Amino acid sequence: MLIAMDATRPNDLGDGKLGRRFYVICESDRSFRAISAGHGGGRDLKGIADFANGKRCAKNFGNAMDSRLTAGGAYVTGETKTSFKGYYRVSAKQDATLLRSFVQFDGEGETANARQRAIGGHPAELLSNVCLRKDLHSPYADGEGYVPFGKLVVYAGGRSDGCTSWSPSDAGQIIPMMKDKPTTLYIYP
């Protein structure tokens, strides 16, 4: 399997339509898929330099720590970790657990800082407006019995701050393909 992303292609086509700029090529079953992927954030250092990227096309790339930019170049996928992010409400009487998987990317040269920057691929979902809730029976509770509780936000097509992010449904198909199977990824440029 080969995966690639053209970060210069638009992520946002307007009118709520997402651009397809992430490609999965599987030679064994002769298949090709093009899906959307989140856009890099970058940073606007007021009065110094503006490295921010918009939703249309990325124009700034980098591998510096804290840059929130995607580095173009070759990567190999590493280990997959799944971590507890917190609980969120799905109905008046039901909460759900957000467990989010993350595929670590490793690189050399222009992508050498990927591991130190925690650059990888993950579902485009997070919790916002997080507070701590006492839940002594949760296996995820901290030493004092508290767990994060917030509102689920799916940001497919949103900022990824240097990582590659996919809709939760696409991530559910892509991440298992990479798990325990080092895969080559190329991000253009």
Please provide the spans of the model-predicted regions.
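A conserved hydrophobic position in a structured secondary element of the catalytic/binding core
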Residues: 166
